[in-house]
């Protein structure tokens, strides 16, 4: 994407001109996980199609709107719908909103996703706090000329998911009595679901779950110095572990069932972020 900085500036200026809030936190709501915004107050909504240079989400379960609202006293941006590499977007387009968030002054990003479980201890409906990632998407959003105004040429990935935010999430879950697991998320290009042979290989590499998002966004946010917290909703067991065929409708069904718990958890975490 040419003139990325200038395009992101144009998007950011449009958002600032059409909203009154200036959040320092942004949350991305994955497939079937959009219930968090029901708890927003003073909500302002912008359709992606109205924001200059913004891609438009095409996947069922992704609304395609940017919200600015309040959770308690905390101002938050919420993306209802994300962009996936398998939809035909470039990696720069997939991660475009995060460049805009950086220019809007966002410092912390909360990512959610619906994904498949590889770890056999994770049943469908399990919430997994992501501790690290493995990139098997075949590319990287930071390939190409680097703009130092966003970040360094060779960004560090020692702590892709903020230890500070993970500890806050764990403490909050314990106080609320919410069960969760911790694990490694593998990013897979899609749109085909994985084969049983691929899942066996991924398990051997140390992956606990696999999905088609989150990894590019994580890399870009770390590159720009933003702290990331990410939680997966395990909606199905991966190929070769479960015997039934995969269905996106089933993914949405399980995500919706677990969504209330996830939203209660993350809503509390976000309100405790400083």
Predicted regions: what they are:
Residues 1-157:
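Metabolite-binding pocket within alpha/beta catalytic cores that recognizes anionic/polar moieties
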Residues 14, 18, 164, 168-179, ...:
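Generic non-transmembrane alpha-helical segments
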Residues 101-105, 203, 222:
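Non-catalytic positions within long, well-ordered alpha-helices that form the structural scaffold/packing
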Residues 107, 208, 227:
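Short acidic/polar active-site loop segments enriched in Thr and Asp
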Residues 146-185:
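Metal-dependent peptidase/peptidase-like ectodomains
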Residues 171-208, 273:
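Active-site/ligand-binding-proximal alpha/beta "capping" segment
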Residues 212-250:
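Zn-dependent metallopeptidase/amidohydrolase metal-coordination segment
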Residues 239-274:
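His/Asp/Glu-rich mid-to-C-terminal helical/loop segments that flank catalytic regions of hydrolases
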């Amino acid at each position: 994407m040419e003139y990325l900085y200038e395009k992101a500036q144009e998007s950011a200026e449009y958002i600032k001109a059409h909203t009154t809030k200036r959040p320092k936190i942004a949350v991305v709501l994955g497939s079937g996980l959009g219930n968090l915004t029901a708890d927003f107050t003073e909500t302002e909504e912008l359709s992606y199609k109205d924001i200059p240079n913004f891609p438009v989400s095409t996947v069922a379960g992704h609304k395609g709107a940017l919200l600015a609202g309040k959770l308690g006293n905390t101002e938050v941006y919420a993306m209802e719908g994300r962009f996936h590499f398998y939809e035909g977007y470039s990696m720069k387009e997939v991660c475009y909103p995060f460049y805009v968030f950086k220019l809007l002054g966002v410092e912390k990003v909360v990512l959610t996703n619906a994904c498949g479980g590889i770890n056999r201890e994770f049943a469908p409906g399990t919430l997994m706090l992501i501790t690290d990632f493995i990139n098997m998407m075949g590319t990287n959003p930071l390939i190409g000329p680097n703009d130092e105004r966003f970040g360094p040429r060779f960004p560090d990935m020692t702590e892709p998911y903020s230890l500070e935010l993970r500890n806050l999430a764990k403490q909050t879950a314990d106080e609320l009595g919410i069960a969760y697991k911790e694990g490694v998320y593998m990013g897979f290009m899609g749109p085909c679901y994985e084969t049983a042979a691929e899942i066996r290989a991924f398990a051997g590499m140390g992956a606990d779950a696999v999905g088609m998002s989150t990894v590019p966004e994580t890399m870009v946010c770390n590159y720009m110095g933003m702290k990331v917290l990410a939680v997966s909703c395990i909606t199905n067991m991966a190929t070769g572990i479960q015997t039934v065929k995969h269905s996106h409708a089933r993914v949405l069904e399980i995500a919706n069932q677990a969504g209330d718990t996830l939203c209660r958890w993350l809503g509390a975490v976000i309100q405790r972020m400083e």
